[in-house]
Amino acid sequence: MAVPKRKTSPSKRGMRRSADALKAPTYIEDKNSGELRRPHHIDLKTGMYRGRSVLPAKD
């Protein structure tokens, strides 16, 4: 069984756990419609992704 050679300091433990905190989701303004959407996601209203029509637009 693997055993740590040194005790993990509170600083190292905290730095490792800092990535576990919940973060607010990021939104960007769409260039075409001006609405907010998640980065790297399809705009569901227009059906566009990276300048191309991927889905039929919702009316």
From Swiss-Prot:
Pfam families, A to Z: Ribosomal_L32p
InterPro entries registered for this protein in UniProt: Ribosomal_bL32, Ribosomal_bL32_bact, Ribosomal_zn-bd
Keywords: Ribonucleoprotein, Ribosomal protein
GO CC annotations, alphabetized: large ribosomal subunit
Signal peptide interval: none
Sample GO molecular function, one term: structural constituent of ribosome
Residue segments, region Disordered: 1-41
Residue ranges with Basic residues bias: 1-16
Biased composition, class Basic and acidic residues, residue ranges: 28-41
BP term (GO), one: translation
Top-level lineage group: Bacteria
Similarity remark: Belongs to the bacterial ribosomal protein bL32 family.
NCBIfam families: rpmF_bact
The name this protein goes by in its record: Large ribosomal subunit protein bL32
